[in-house]
A protein has these predicted regions:
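S-adenosyl-L-methionine-dependent methyltransferase catalytic module, highlighting the catalytic core
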Residues: 33, 37, 41-77, 100, ...
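Glycine-rich helix-loop-beta junction characteristic of Rossmann-like nucleotide cofactor-binding loops
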Residues: 76-87
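Glycine-rich phosphate-binding loop signature in dinucleotide/nucleotide-binding domains
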Residues: 85-88, 154-158
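Conserved class I S-adenosyl-L-methionine
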Residues: 88-99
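Conserved SAM-binding loop of SAM-dependent methyltransferases across substrates and taxa
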Residues: 100-111
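Conserved SAM-binding motif I beta-strand of class I
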Residues: 113-119
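Short catalytic micro-motifs in class I SAM-dependent methyltransferases
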Residues: 166-171
């Protein structure tokens, strides 16, 4: 336990590995209700099972197996923030870049408002969000985040209590500070933004470079789904977030991508005994100041 600069007592949740939350968050009725509600997606195996009955392509099934642990990790962070808002439903969520996670969010928070923002082109769909996946167009706001460099093209949405931008920022060619400045306009004062993105300095990528292999994917020949343009380190993301007008509430590096291979098992073992800077994913919680 420690005390923040605001004088609140803070509890370091063991399951949150270093994220700081006011201890009152764990005692309010909203948190207890969320804990009772979200019992189905605590483990990655439950997420894989949830989608098993679907007639999904092998690409989509592989994507779910790879990202199920990340989805469970992200849902835990979302639940903690939702509990900390200490307000009755509906909470307004904005999922930037809809995916399978959007469905998990809707199932986990049935009383709340789930909005989405981003592309809705067939070309932009892929293993992460196939065309036959259900999508509520009534709560979807179409916007190309690369247009964040043009303030006259900004759109508005109902202000979000919690926005989620998971595995999105690395797909954009527009400067990330401009993107986050736009996203900031979609969040209410005191609201939160969760950013998830791959760690460009992970152990696997360092080893690839050491072996003379390029650690990053070639940009694809698909303007609507080009792959990764740029990945950002923890230090870069902190600086970008502050420049965009956010407060950094927490940051964690974690190994939440699952790959079934002997090489992956060896890398997992090495990462588990190395510094956190070698882990594969970065999750950052940002707050819009009041």
């Amino acid at each position: 336990m420690r005390r923040s600069s605001l004088g609140k007592r803070l509890f370091v949740s063991p399951s949150c590995n270093g994220f700081l939350f006011p201890i009152s968050w764990f005692c309010n009725e909203q948190f207890l209700n969320l804990e009772k509600l979200r019992t189905m997606f605590r483990m990655s195996v439950e997420i894989v099972k949830h989608f098993q009955a679907r007639n999904l392509s092998e690409e989509s099934q592989s994507y779910i197996r790879t990202h199920a642990k990340r989805y469970a990790f992200l849902l835990e962070k979302v639940s903690m923030l939702a509990a900390g808002l200490n307000q009755r439903p509906p909470i307004t969520f904005l999922d930037i870049g809809p995916s399978f996670f959007t469905e998990l969010l809707r199932v986990s928070f049935p009383q709340d408002k789930i909005m989405t923002l981003g592309y809705d082109f067939p070309e932009s769909r892929g293993g992460h969000f196939p065309m036959d996946t259900a999508h509520d167009n009534r709560q979807h706001f179409h916007f190309n985040l690369n247009d964040a460099q043009f303030p006259d093209r900004y759109i508005s949405t109902p202000p979000a209590d919690i926005a989620i931008m998971a595995e999105v920022i690395e797909h954009l060619y527009t400067a990330p500070t401009l993107v986050l400045r736009f996203v900031r306009t979609l969040i209410r004062s005191g609201g939160f933004l969760i950013v998830e993105t791959p760690n460009p300095a992970s152990l696997k990528k360092r080893l690839k470079l050491l072996w003379g292999k390029h650690p990053y994917e070639m940009i694809r020949e698909n303007v609507e789904n080009p792959g990764h343009f740029r990945e950002y380190t923890k230090g870069e993301l902190c600086a970008i977030a502050k420049s965009a007008g956010f407060e950094v509430s927490g940051c964690e590096l974690s190994n939440y991508f699952s790959h079934d291979s002997s090489k992956a098992s060896i890398l997992r073992l090495l990462r588990s005994h190395g510094p956190s800077s070698l882990r594969r994913g970065i999750t950052m919680i940002l707050r819009k100041p009041v």
